[in-house]
Amino acid sequence: MPLHHLTRFPRLELIGAPTPLEYLPRLSDYLGREIYIKRDDVTPIAMGGNKLRKLEFLVADALREGADTLITAGAIQSNHVRQTAAVAAKLGLHCVALLENPIGTTAENYLTNGNRLLLDLFNTQIEMCDALTDPDAQLQTLATRIEAQGFRPYVIPVGGSSALGAMGYVESALEIAQQCAEVVGLSSVVVASGSAGTHAGLAVGLEHLMPDVELIGVTVSRSVAEQKPRVISLQQAIAGQLALTATADIHLWDDYFAPGYGVPNDAGMEAVKLLASLEGVLLDPVYTGKAMAGLIDGISQKRFNDDGPILFIHTGGAPALFAYHPHV
């Protein structure tokens, strides 16, 4: 078993059973390709999402260290911050969130609805900053201040994207391999690539479990030149902790995130509408809408290795739909 070292890491069970892997018949007919979806949007806490996989490992480590406070950072509409705050509430921990307004909007819906509304319901302590220019350093400064107030803080990086957090997506690769066995021979997997932990964890896991499968990361905030070193750095760190080699190339498409992180675009919103109308599946304007736009265009432009089945990783994010309506 190539990933047996995964069991060495403490893990807090937050998700339970594997998330569904489903065939999308109407989208498949529409695109002329077999399309499957991994439903990490339906994880069980606080409207779901992929970050719970990372939090299973990160919060287990926080509890092991005796922390009573989780500190993390992200955009006002961060799905990661929302899920971290929910887990903190569930466990009776304090949560401090350092937030930025990356799109500089004054739209009330963006500033108060969606994920931001949920943070208030989870009784999260909100700290605003002008910009997360150096989030690791900014989080450490905040942790020092919180510690001076008598708390025992544990810092969770942006997106939960550390080598430890990314173990959650090595675990996801195991689920995918087991769910696909004798059911479907995948050719490609498509995932949104942002803080890079989800992408890197899948890269390590799939390289060892499904080495013939092409993994495509659709960037949501950076060019390939900016994003690839981030994914590779985490890929190598994960592999090192699992005593594995990781030699698979990292494939990224950066044609679909303009005009920038957190700013909806036409192709992404069309993808949101398409999945909702054809399959009753809700994507979001920031991550999965843009990643699905990449999948759709990738088929049209023949960018995939072959014409075989494609799996789309649904990382969640639907609460942001309410924050982005009608526009920002």
Curated annotation (Swiss-Prot):
Lineage, top-rank taxon, reads Bacteria
What EC number(s) would the UniProt record show? Answer: 4.4.1.15
Q: What class of enzyme is it?
A: lyase
Q: Does the keyword Lyase apply?
A: yes
Q: Which InterPro entries match?
A: ACCD_DCysDesulf, D-Cys_desShydrase, D_Cys_desulphydr_bac, TrpB-like_PALP, TrpB-like_PALP_sf
CDD domains given for it?
Answer: ACCD
Instruction: Show the Pfam families listed in the entry.
Output: PALP (PF00291)
Homology family: Belongs to the ACC deaminase/D-cysteine desulfhydrase family.
Quaternary structure and interacting proteins, as annotated: Homodimer.
| Database matches in HAMAP family | D_Cys_desulfhydr
Described by its record, this protein's role is as follows: Catalyzes the alpha,beta-elimination reaction of D-cysteine and of several D-cysteine derivatives. It could be a defense mechanism against D-cysteine.
Q: What is this protein called?
A: D-cysteine desulfhydrase
GN (gene name)? dcyD
